[in-house]
Amino acid sequence: MRSPVQLQHGSDATNGFHTLQPHDQTDGPIKRVCLTRGMHVPEHVAMHHTHDVGPDQCCSSVVQMIHAPPESVWALVRRFDNPKVYKNFIRQCRIVQGDGLHVGDLREVMVVSGLPAVSSTERLEILDEERHVISFSVVGGDHRLKNYRSVTTLHASDDEGTVVVESYIVDVPPGNTEEETLSFVDTIVRCNLQSLARSTNRQ
């Protein structure tokens, strides 16, 4: 079984960066930094990808390098009101509470056919314009991804581009394994971030 990962303290955590290592499974919730094994990220980025993972949940993350400054990428990522700008699996989106710019606002998303879902009601959890962090959770809808929560961060790369990190936590659906759940969600997230890279470069 693929194990979640936790922040590894000690000699590997130096110069403001953290190296992430696997953590043994436990029976209760545990705070885990859900990033790819061996990934080096700034400490202020890693802290945003910490989730309370229960025994029937899984978490993972996907990283995308984009050859554009963070401000250009953020202009698309921040659009809680219009995720279709780079998420191709979304057929329609409408704000049902608020204006899409404040924590607590809700959106209703309709997905394209062919996916094991019809709709999703999502709540904006974080919108940090200064640090380039956005997070949403799924609070309703017709789908199988119960208790899904996503966090996306942007930080500058050494070559004046952008590193996008998106992590998530979700319940493992009944009848599915952790590996199957991670494979499915990772694929969706990866496709979205690849589309984000293409959309940013077209600006």
Curated annotation (Swiss-Prot):
Domain of life of the source: Eukaryota
A Pfam family hit: Polyketide_cyc2
UniProt-listed GO biological process terms: abscisic acid-activated signaling pathway
Motif (Latch loop): 143-145
CDD domains xrefs: PYR_PYL_RCAR_like
UniProt-listed InterPro entries: Plant_def-hormone_signal (IPR050279), Polyketide_cyclase/dehydratase (IPR019587), START-like_dom_sf (IPR023393)
Molecular function as annotated in GO: abscisic acid binding; protein phosphatase inhibitor activity; signaling receptor activity
Regions of compositional bias (Polar residues) in chain numbering: 1-18
Region (START-like): 51-201
Keyword Membrane found: yes
Any one GO CC term of the record: cytoplasm
Subcellular localization(s) per the UniProt record: Cytoplasm; Nucleus; Cell membrane
Swiss-Prot/TrEMBL keywords: Abscisic acid signaling pathway, Cell membrane, Cytoplasm, Membrane, Nucleus, Protein phosphatase inhibitor, Receptor
Residues annotated to bind abscisate: 87, 117-122, 144-150, 166
Residues of the site described as Involved in ABA binding: V185
Start and end residues of each stretch annotated as Disordered: 1-29
Marked site: Involved in interactions with PP2Cs: P116, T177
Motif (Gate loop): 113-117
Function summary: Receptor for abscisic acid (ABA) required for ABA-mediated responses such as stomatal closure and germination inhibition. Inhibits the activity of group-A protein phosphatases type 2C (PP2Cs) in an ABA-independent manner but more efficiently when activated by ABA. Confers enhanced sensitivity to ABA. Can be activated by both (-)-ABA and (+)-ABA.
Record's comment describing the protein's domains: Upon interaction with ABA, the 'latch' and 'gate' loops change in conformation leading to a tight dimerization and the creation a surface that enables the receptor to dock into and inhibit the PP2C active site.
Subunit structure: Monomer. Homodimer. Binds ABA on one subunit only. Binds to CARs protein in an ABA-independent manner, both at the plasma membrane and in the nucleus. Binds both (-)-ABA and (+)-ABA. Interacts with HAB1, ABI1 and ABI2, and possibly with other PP2Cs.
Recorded family membership: Belongs to the PYR/PYL/RCAR abscisic acid intracellular receptor family.
Protein name as catalogued: Abscisic acid receptor PYL5
Source organism of this protein record: Arabidopsis thaliana (Mouse-ear cress)
Lineage, top ranks: Eukaryota, Viridiplantae, Streptophyta, Embryophyta, Tracheophyta
Gene for this chain: PYL5
